[in-house]
Structures are given as structure tokens and as C-alpha cells.
Amino acid sequence: SLFMLMKEIYPPAYSHFWTDNGAWYLNSQYCKENILKELLEEKADYYFIFYNNEIVGNFRILWDENLKGVCAEKQVKLHRLYLHQKIQGKGIGKKLVFWLEEKARENNYQTIWLDAMNEQEQAFQFYKKLGYKYHSHTFLPFNLMYARVRKMNQIYKLLSK
């Protein structure tokens, strides 16, 4: 199940950001009720990432989700991309981002954007290498998350035709 996958993927990377080791986040975002609600959203897609016939990650795409201040009519948000540690560094994330960029272009989207945790510098550098630029930041409203790690960088890429 998605919940079991996230219980394996999320804690090694993020448990130290939380007073409860991320249990509240996992239970609220990946409980059956929330997943069913998100699956019913009209302009959202959920994907599992497979590697060697094993599920190693997941992500969401939110179509027509706009980042304020970006002058592009059609925008798409890459939301909650998580990869298992054992396959990081194998180029899977890069292939996934390129796949999403191509899918967005095919559907006439001009911009892809996402939130990247300020405390996860390697993630920001990964997207920067792929041409994504800093736009602004926001703060997560999660009370069980330590205040010093709530900053999210909003980054984007304008897509060429």
C-alpha cells in the first residue's frame, strides 16, 4: 500500500523535522481517506514509480495549479515526489522530471513548479541543475514540525516548445 511505502521512504529523510518523527504527517497525508479524496480530484494525477518491478516512490501532478506571480497561463505543479533512498542517484528523478516536462508540453502547459524544502539543499540543487529557478517561499503550517524547517522554496521552470 501507499501508506506502507511512505512509512519506509519518509522517515529516513524527514523524521528529524518533526516532534513526532513525522507520524502525524504520514497519517494525515497517506491515510486511506485522504488518498481516496485526492484520487477523486479532477485535475490531479497520482503515480507510483517502479524500478526493477518494485514500487520505489510516488508523486502527484496538479494540473492548472498556478504559482502566483508567474506569467504563464497554463501551469502544473509537481507535488510530493518521494523516492526510496536505495534508488536515489540512479537518474530516476531526472527521468521523471523530463517525462513530466514532456507531458506538460504535449498538453500546452508553459510552466512546471513545485515546493522544495529549504532544509533539503540537495533537492534544490537537483532541480537547479535541471533549469528550475527560485521564485519565492512559503512556510508549512504544520504545528508538529519544528519551526526552523518549515520554509518551502517555490521553484519553477518555463517550458520551451
Label every model-predicted segment.
Residues F3-K86, V97-F98, K103, T138-L140, ...:
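Acetyl-CoA-dependent GNAT
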Residues L83, M117-N118:
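Short amphipathic helical patch at the helix-1/turn junction of helix-turn-helix
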Residues G93, V97, E119-A123, F139-A147:
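Short glycine/proline-centered loop/turn elements that form peptide/ligand docking sites
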Residues V97, A104-A116:
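Conserved GNAT acetyl-CoA-binding A-motif
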Residues W113-A116, K128-R150:
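Conserved catalytic-core motifs of GNAT/GCN5-like acyltransferases
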Residues R148-K161:
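Terminal substrate-recognition subdomain of acyl/acetyltransferases
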